[in-house]
Amino acid sequence: MDANGVDLTRLDGVFVRQQTQMADVGYLVFGVPYVTANKYQVFSLPPVAHEWVPTAQEVAGFEEIMFIHEESDTSDRVGWAFLGAASLRPLQYHFGSTSTGQMFTAVKSFKIGGWCGCPWEMDVLSGPPGDQILKGQVVQNFTPYCSRCFDAFCLATTFIDVVPASSFPGKDARFTVRTSLSCCGRVNNCCAPTCCRPKAIFDILDNSGKLVGVVQKHFVAGEGGEACCRMCLGVVNFSLKFPPQSSGEERALLLSAIMLNESYQPTA
């Protein structure tokens, strides 16, 4: 899938930067139960080492190739924020090319989580509104149940399956994104990404459990007070290194899987 303008198979990976929205700072300071619709810039990931830590100067020099915009109802953002559960709100992520516009859409419905038999999921669609084609799903993996409960509640680890439409109806995962926020995983991600530990590293596994790619979540140094503000608000920067043999469709699904996982991460 070339996503109508951006051939994802030609990229080693992408760097995604959530835009700082100062209105969120005001809502937080004054205790207003509201969150703004999130917006992200997507850049082509330059050839970088595994332990890359981006600087503000590097990020400023990146060329934007895509954007991601959240579409959600204002009433949902107010209502769920009032309940302290803004991450549960239904939404759509519109992925677009800076040159050609809309590329594909990821639709997230209301799901509490696999712990109660309601795993997170998003449908990934391409095509114009009213004539969209399902390209696949990204869904929280909660099987076996007891093991995944232990992973989630004791190890702060979640698993998101990437399921291309070609795998239906069996829904066999092509990749799994393993996100660990603790010190107990393959990489110690405790207190990351912050000024103390500038990156967290998450794993992309193939259907045999082999490590085939990584996602790095970054604290971008050199931005002064803005960097600290972004950290406290949970505003994200992450880089996604695509598995070498993945198709364009699979890469779009992997990017959607990261967005699904991010949409459920707690923020300030």
Go through each PLM region and give its residues.
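Low-complexity or membrane-interfacial segments used for flexible interactions
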Residues: 1-123, 127-268
